[in-house]
UniProtKB/Swiss-Prot annotation:
Residues 376-396 are annotated as: Disordered. One of its GO terms (biological process) is tRNA (guanine-N7)-methylation. WD repeats lie at residues 52-91, 94-133, 137-178, 180-220. It holds the Pfam family WD40. It comes from Xenopus tropicalis. It is found in: Nucleus. SMART domains: WD40. This is tRNA (guanine-N(7)-)-methyltransferase non-catalytic subunit wdr4. Pathway: tRNA modification; N(7)-methylguanine-tRNA biosynthesis. Non-catalytic component of the METTL1-WDR4 methyltransferase complex required for the formation of N(7)-methylguanine in a subset of RNA species, such as tRNAs, mRNAs and microRNAs (miRNAs). In the METTL1-WDR4 methyltransferase complex, wdr4 acts as a scaffold for tRNA-binding. Required for the formation of N(7)-methylguanine at position 46 (m7G46) in a large subset of tRNAs that contain the 5'-RAGGU-3' motif within the variable loop. M7G46 interacts with C13-G22 in the D-loop to stabilize tRNA tertiary structure and protect tRNAs from decay.
Length: 396
């Protein structure tokens, strides 16, 4: 997992987190989360601690100022770090269920975490030992949570194709639903600006643009229909696994699809309108990406030789940045810790289990019907032969 903030970069893999301050030549901050305290069982509830829990990091994010970094792991810990003036662990708190996503509020005062049971909890950043507060809930697993740029809305998406927009000050008040996806909604990204636009990605292979206040769909892009300059594969799923945005020179978007060895680059034109500007093919399937504050696109490649890639837009085309000292230094540190990071988080089909099971009842019905007809035909044939033999015996 790769995350960039205004103060630097964070990389996670397995239970490890590497934190790097922008422009620093010092070795990155390195922590194994398995070394942190674990939640103890309450008296009389020895079974409350899950013995199957690992320390794998599940979700992470920087605060808008870059001053804080938070992550959650498979042991149901919410770990908060301070990144300025140096990286250090501030607190370890616990969540009730394993989390699928987390984000900070625009003011940086709260952390919102979404979990597998469909709930969203908020945690205070300043009161770093305070327990979380339940804000809202869905009836199915949440896959992402976001906050509108003005901080007025909490936006959530779930396994059952729904995008829900709730008021921050009264989360039980639902402002709108953005409905149209035909599979689980995997990614949410509110776009900067005053137009109240939301971008969503899904397992149905579409990228959709919404007016989230009204719930109106503005545009839908079918990813399988884009000209990517590569051979089309039958039944290929374009599951959106990551979206990142840069607003330095207009709104530029970078997107990844699970199992697709390349980067989709879009721009948001007036209208508004999503336009594919470029597809960058890679030799390895990228694991993650993010923009930094200077409009550079960083890519976690999963390749031991070149674990980090950096791109810059020049004359309307995204080009690889070569001989970058910071990338070279960080890549070397990643290679040194490659085994601990488990290949910086090797590719996994995170969303494969979320697809609806297709039950072909018609095929089963036809097989049973054919078997029934064969049995009836055999019985009829046997019934016709028996009387004929009796007649012959009578004539004798």
């Amino acid at each position: 997992m790769l995350r960039l903030g205004s103060s630097g970069l964070a990389l996670t893999g397995s239970s490890r987190v590497l934190g790097h301050r922008a422009g620093s030549e010092c070795p990155p901050f390195h922590l194994d989360c398995s070394s942190l305290e674990k939640q103890s069982a309450a008296p009389g509830q020895e079974g409350s601690v899950d013995p199957q829990g690992s320390d794998k990091i599940l979700a992470a994010a920087f605060s808008p100022s870059g001053e804080y970094f938070a992550l959650t792991d498979d042991n149901k810990r919410l770990i908060l770090f301070q990144t300025k003036p140096a990286w250090e662990t501030i607190s370890v708190r616990w969540v009730s269920r394993r989390c699928t996503a987390l984000t900070f509020s625009p003011c940086g005062a709260h952390i919102l975490v979404a979990d597998k049971s469909g709930d969203v909890f908020s945690f205070s950043v300043r009161r770093s030992r305070e327990a979380g507060r339940l804000e809202l809930g869905h009836l199915s697993m949440l896959l992402d949570v976001a906050v509108s740029p003005d901080g007025n809305h909490i936006i959530t998406c779930d396994r059952d194709e729904k995008i829900r927009v709730s008021r921050w000050d009264s989360p039980h008040v639902i402002m709108s639903f953005c409905l149209g996806h035909t599979e689980f909604v995997s990614q949410l990204l509110p776009l900067p600006g005053a137009d109240k636009l939301l971008l969503s990605g899904s397992g149905d292979g579409t990228l959709r643009l919404w007016d989230y206040e009204s719930g109106r769909e503005v545009q839908s892009v079918t990813l399988s229909g884009l000209d990517l300059g590569m051979e089309r594969q039958e039944n290929k799923r374009f599951t959106v696994s990551r979206i990142s945005c840069c607003a330095c020179n207009g709104i530029q978007l970078a997107m990844l699809c699970e199992g697709v060895p390349g980067i989709f680059l879009f721009s948001v034109a007036p209208g508004p309108r999503l336009t594919l500007t470029q597809y960058v093919a890679l030799t390895h399937t990228p694991l993650d990406l993010d923009f930094d504050g200077s409009a550079y696109l960083w890519v976690l490649s999963g390749d031991w030789e070149e674990p980090l890639l950096k791109y810059k837009e020049l004359n309307g085309q995204w080009q690889s940045v070569v001989n970058d000292e910071e990338v070279t230094r960080l890549s070397g540190f990643i290679r040194e810790n490659w085994a601990d990071l488990e290949g910086a988080g090797a590719p996994e089909n995170r969303f494969a289990v979320l697809y609806k099971a297709v039950v072909d009842n018609m095929a089963t019905y036809l097989q049973k019907k054919e078997l029934r007809l064969e049995n009836e035909k055999r019985k009829t044939t046997e019934g016709q032969v028996a009387p004929a033999s009796k007649v012959q015996k009578t004539e004798c």
